[in-house]
Amino acid sequence: MKQSSFSYKKTLGIQSLMVIIPHEDDEINTAGAAIYSAVKEGIHVKCVFMTNGDWVYPAFVRFDETLRALRLLGVEKENVIFLGFPDGGNRGERSVYLHGLDKPVDAGGRTETYGCGDIVDYHYEKYGQHQKYTWNGLLADLKDVILSNRPDALMVTDFDYHVDHRMLSIAFEKVMGSILNEPGNTYEPLVFKGFAYATSYVSYKDYYERHFLSSRVYRKEMRYLDCETDNPVYEWNKRIRFPVASACRGPGLLHNVLYKALICHMSQKNIEHVRQVFNGDLIFWLRRTDNLIYKGKVTVSSGVSSYLHDFQMMNAKQIADTRPAMEDYLWMPDDKGKWCRCDFEKPQHIEAMALYGNIEGTGRILKGKFTFNNGFSIDVGPLAKQGHETLISFPPQDGITWVRFDIGETEGDGAGLSEWEILPSKYVCHPFIQICVDGHFAYDWHVYPGEAPAISCYSAEKIGELRWLLDGQEISLQELNSQIKNIKQKSVVRVELKDNPEVWCEAFIAPADIIYRMTSSVKRVIDQLGVWWEHQMEKTPHHKLKRIKTISDYRKIIQ
């Protein structure tokens, strides 16, 4: 049963989606619920794997596990692409970013991309030869696979603490920056970046809590502990939260399609993480590709101007370090009259701008001023700390042929900008809303004795006035929250936009009476026992995987 107006096709306005991930199994940790729902909506979904995941287990094991998992989510083999680069290892021992700058990496005797059986690597399938294990080779193939398919949206693993995750995040942003800065480029996909670890694979073991909870950051698994996520630029309250289909929620893990897909990756012992991966929302951070700066010419008073428009808000070289230092990402002018300017060949419509500064706290812009060719100007500052977004909104400006930013007052030696966004609109997606209880996405929520749940509404953007209904009767949010505390029977809570009722969401709220508490406890125990039993049944074949040498050996184990 549909519980909201949200859909990937209509809300995001897309017909195709590409998910780019570092290893086989990260497709589920990063975007499993999105893959499943997008396929169900008829969106053409492709999954691209950067490495063969061949650090411990043979590539043919990882490939087969992935194809079986994705088949459960609706993605067939022809829509799965393996770039064929080596797993970088636990400390980047075979990373093409760390060791493939001057010559190909030697990964167990291999120096080129490869496939197994009837699966060939991307470069060989397209060009008839394998790609060298080099950083430039990875960038070339990643750019090629994106431009060959030109998906409407991309979902990409971000800067988790694993070396390969960090490498993919950096590689993708370099490639995307290259694409967007090409003269005459018209390709501006939606880009969503999300984590596979601290909000998913190694997050809280909370699946069997009273309520189905939304994603949270497990700070013990973070490396940038003074930041809100492992990408220091991101702010938690600016994440995009997508609702999750019922098949990806339960009831129980044994009936959860994502659970069934995740445990296909037996080599990774993923069954030990199933209580952590699945949440009531799927979270990403939106990266704007409609930035008008890519259509202009940037000049600066001093410093490296390309850092202002390279699509990289951060960059690190020593990605095997626990907490890599940020390098080569910041426009940092060193003259007295510090300024940057963007000139456009054609007049532009501008509604907002965003500035991103120094991540590491060694300097910050305190005061600055934007000036437009039409005489409009606006003072800004101080910029947000830790490189966070400073969003500047103003009345829409038309006919703009140039914009200039003059830096006034600064502090520290490292004051500068990592990125400058000039935005033609404040938002890029159609509005959607989701009912929340105590901040968690609510679908079927039971109120336990002594609880005082607070109902609210999430939206990814600023929205108009809301209309709340309880069992079809209009009600104020204050009165709704008052009644929910003492709810006596299962009720339907609905919220919709007053000026656009086609944007709506519903949730079922019911009392957790003694019968419900008893039956749900029994079901929970049965489900946990089922998962435990599957775990026991998996142990022996998992140990055998470590000793296999051939595909036929593998087939005998999984039969």
Regions of interest found by a model, annotated:
Residues 321-432:
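Aromatic, loop-rich ligand-recognition surfaces of beta-strand-rich domains
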